[in-house]
Amino acid sequence: MRVLIIVCIFGAATLGGCAESKDTTSSFDMSEYRKIMERQKHEQAAVESTESSAPKLSPEEEERAGDTEAQRRNFPMAGLHYTKAVNAEPTRNSARLKLGQLMLQQGLFDAAVTQFKDVLTRDPNSAVAHQGIAQAYLQQGKLQEAEAALTKAIALDPSSWVSQNLLGLVYDQQQRHSDAIAAYKAALAIRPREPNVLNNLGLAYALSGDHETAIQFFEQALAAGSNSPKLHNNLGVAYAHRERYVDALESFKKAMDEPRAYNNLGVALLRMGNARVALVCFEKAIELNPQYYEKASENLRQAQKTLSQSNGKTISQSTEAVSCP
């Protein structure tokens, strides 16, 4: 979230593949985290057996040790040091904020909210704490609460592009795409050429039906240095909506293997009503990889069903040639 930018996925796809997605920070794998924590319980027991002869760290030193472990991406040990810091000095807000951010990254949202609210009891004007609470609520789907927390965070720190970006995510989930666009533009006014925000702005335009403008912002995100598979996928979907099928396929290929790229193009076409060409794309995906996962076969059956219901005619009249790029 670095300052975290929470992942925000919109809606479960009814077909396999091609889901548009917000560009965000991946959360720490919780199952793996638990394994690490269990292993480090034993390691810590060995460490504690020698602590009696080792100098005890001050809260400040524990926090610095946590920072070092966080930079190494050793998150369980970082959390251990931050916890020791706040246990020794409960009013140490800086360590508590870091502990809350770490909990956010690990998906421990209720625990993170507890840490941030504890900070607010001593510093009600902590924009970082309000932002952290909003991030947790957003992940939990508590959109009204997230919006309220972000409104406070932005009022306290209008220079936070992260809060503006998060507010855009909230608005998009509330289907308030025009408000989301305004929030993303406010974020870009603070931090121009931020790839994550450019991607999110492009997707907000796509969700509102303006795929041409969406393409412009997706391409700007690429030009700004992003090579995210999610971005390439979003751009591919937008290209497909503008009937730029060759460009769409090439964009999908940058995000995934070739069979999956054909499957995703087929999904986009089927959703747009062009079942006839979608069917050919699904067949191509299976041809390239006969063992291609069940999604392509399921999508192929869906395309065949749609064609059968339309008496074998393409629903969309935009593409006459029955071929997939």
Label each residue range with its predicted role.
Residues 88, 122, 156, 190, ...:
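Structural marker of alpha-solenoid helical repeat scaffolds
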Residues 24-31, 35-50, 207, 259, ...:
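Terminal, low-structured helical/coil segments at or just beyond the last alpha-helical repeat
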Residues 59, 93-94, 127-128, 161-162, ...:
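Helix-start (N-cap) detector for alpha-helical repeat units in TPR-like alpha-solenoids
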Residues 19-22:
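Bacterial signal peptide processing site
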Residues 72-84, 94, 105-118, 128, ...:
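Structural signature of tandem alpha-helical TPR/SEL1-like repeats
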Residues 52-94, 98-105, 135, 139, ...:
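Alpha-helical segment of the N-proximal tetratricopeptide repeat
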Residues 64, 98, 132, 165-166, ...:
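Canonical tetratricopeptide repeat
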